């Protein structure tokens, strides 16, 4: 009998150990998944707090954001900024890094995921639109203006890369936005419709429309949009344009990779460019005046001409700042290249 009890006890111990190991493995996987979900490509400053928030745009899409606040602001009513971009990135990447820095400088800052991307709502996933993404900035202004510690008459916005174009477009129509800054600005409608440096021919444009039009039959039959295998190559061959290599160095390496970023993964839908090729942004750029514009671009950025052309076409007050030796993606995360002191002085001067 004692022997039988011993065997039973031993068996229970083995089963208990196996169960404990299984739970430990499950907990580890859960922790790893949580760490991936909560992964940021930068360290949070000990001078600020970060809080996950949600809000809706006027199309009813729930947007996800992170609200950064300076710890020393207390009950003070302060100026605020909304930040988004780059095009195809998420708030845990560049926009969060900018928010982190600008909150240190005394602003309430909202970094957010645009509609249909990241943790924000909208289906199908990974689509963009001149209308929706312009509206996303105004929805962010709605949210900031409802915060008890924000002066709703002192709200500005920052757009990075393609969201620089949307930030300018939002500022044209939303007169609550008192100042706008862009870094490494892209006009997504222009590059989609005309190609880089406006070199797309009429024949190439027609072929692009034909290809996407036929793709719509496939998408309609399947009941879901098609995606490319990957936005960027998994490995570089070496003969890619330099700006593609630069994008790879950010999005496909630990420097900037994030599982929610479509630029790090499979990319936009194959038909995503349709509306951008037919609906130009920035038609009324002069109407931002008399509110100020700050355009920041890298000296060696392939995208520099977008900022230069906006500067030519916009009315005063406006300023173009060229960062020596910088390429496009340097202004995503290289804090020694991004002129945060200039951004601070620009917004403090114009949000008062």
PLM region spans:
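Alpha/beta-hydrolase-fold enzymes
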Residues: 168-250
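N-terminal cap/lid segment of alpha/beta-hydrolase-fold proteins
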Residues: 30-76
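The serine-hydrolase catalytic nucleophile loop
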Residues: 88-100, 114
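Short beta-strand element of the alpha/beta-hydrolase
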Residues: 76-86
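Conserved alpha/beta-hydrolase
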Residues: 101-121
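Alpha/beta-hydrolase active-site loop
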Residues: 127-148
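Catalytic histidine-centered segment of alpha/beta-hydrolase-like enzymes
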Residues: 326-337
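Short beta-strand/loop motif that positions the catalytic acidic residue
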Residues: 288, 294-297
